[in-house]
């Protein structure tokens, strides 16, 4: 896993009783196949390779093709964490950036993030679902009596959670009602806002853009600001109902982090945020 991987990845490995081999990323926060090879060396005990289809902290899409190649060489399971960013694949102009996703053994995407579905809507997709059924199917006389068809699809056999809601139904209704084009337009709006914010930060003498955004996340510095200044800035924006922002760290340094997702966020928010940083 990358040093930028979501905390839930390490937690899942801990539950499984597996140790994580943390692979350092460079200034661009992107996990690459080359970096994995360098970290693994001659080890032959690698079971899983996890890459991100849009990291949480920086919105970076890992080198999925390179990571998939290394996973195949190691005979390891290749999982892509696309909980936040994989939805951007709905945009034709973004699909090339996800080259390699087709080689994943499994991937995850959360419609409750960038598809605006109710909280808890999550899709875990397997290349070979029978492996998941073999792993997760629970048995008991009170359960087996319901299995009258060997080919019947039951989500409870594809994960460790037994009783569950039909959380995919609201996603289907939203897509059926609004259509894919409406979802594409909403996602694209977030990308446009991120690019405009990045350009404004890059043009300002008081701020420094850390990296060009790939998705809707923008990381930046403000000259002379430290942790306390970032905290006050975030609190003021929330108090004034301008925006809810949560500063983060980049390589241990407190920095600003903006995430653009809501399709009704006006373009004028860029000017408001810049005024709050320079006023």
Description of each model-found segment:
Residues 208-237:
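Conserved PLP-binding catalytic core of the aspartate aminotransferase-like
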Residues 74, 250-279:
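PLP-dependent enzyme catalytic core of the Aspartate aminotransferase-like
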Residues 1-133:
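Conserved PLP-enzyme active-site core in the AAT-like
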Residues 4-6, 27-28, 54-56, 85, ...:
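Short, glycine-/Ser/Thr-/acidic-enriched flexible segments
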Residues 99-205, 212:
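Active-site C-terminal subdomain of aminotransferase-like
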Residues 212, 217, 240-257:
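Conserved PLP cofactor-binding pocket of PLP-dependent enzymes
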Residues 173-174, 219-221, 256-261:
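Short, hydrophobic beta-strand segments
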């Amino acid at each position: 896993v990358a040093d930028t991987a979501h905390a839930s990845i390490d937690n899942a490995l801990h539950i499984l009783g597996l140790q994580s081999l943390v692979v350092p990323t460079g200034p661009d926060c992107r996990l690459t196949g080359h970096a994995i090879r360098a970290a693994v060396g001659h080890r032959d005990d690698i079971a899983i390779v996890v890459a991100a289809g849009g990291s949480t902290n920086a919105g970076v899409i890992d080198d999925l093709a390179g990571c998939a190649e290394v996973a195949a060489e190691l005979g390891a399971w290749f999982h892509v964490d696309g909980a936040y960013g994989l939805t951007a694949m709905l945009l034709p102009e973004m699909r090339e950036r996800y080259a390699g996703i087709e080689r994943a053994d499994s991937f995850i995407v959360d419609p409750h993030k960038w598809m605006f579905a109710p909280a808890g809507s999550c899709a875990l997709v397997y290349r070979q679902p029978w492996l998941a059924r073999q792993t997760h199917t629970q048995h008991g006389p009170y359960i087996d009596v319901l299995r009258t068809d060997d080919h019947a699809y039951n989500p409870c056999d594809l994960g460790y959670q037994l009783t569950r809601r039909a959380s995919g139904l609201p996603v289907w209704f939203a897509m059926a009602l609004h259509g894919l084009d409406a979802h594409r337009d909403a996602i694209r709006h977030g990308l446009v806002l991120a690019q405009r914010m990045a350009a404004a930060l890059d043009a300002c003498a008081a701020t420094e853009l850390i990296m060009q955004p790939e998705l809707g996340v923008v990381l930046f510095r403000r000259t002379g600001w430290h942790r306390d200044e970032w905290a006050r800035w975030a609190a003021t924006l929330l108090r004034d109902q301008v925006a809810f922002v949560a500063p983060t760290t980049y390589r241990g340094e407190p920095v600003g982090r903006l995430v653009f997702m809501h399709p009704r966020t006006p373009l004028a928010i860029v000017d408001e945020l810049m005024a709050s940083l320079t006023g």
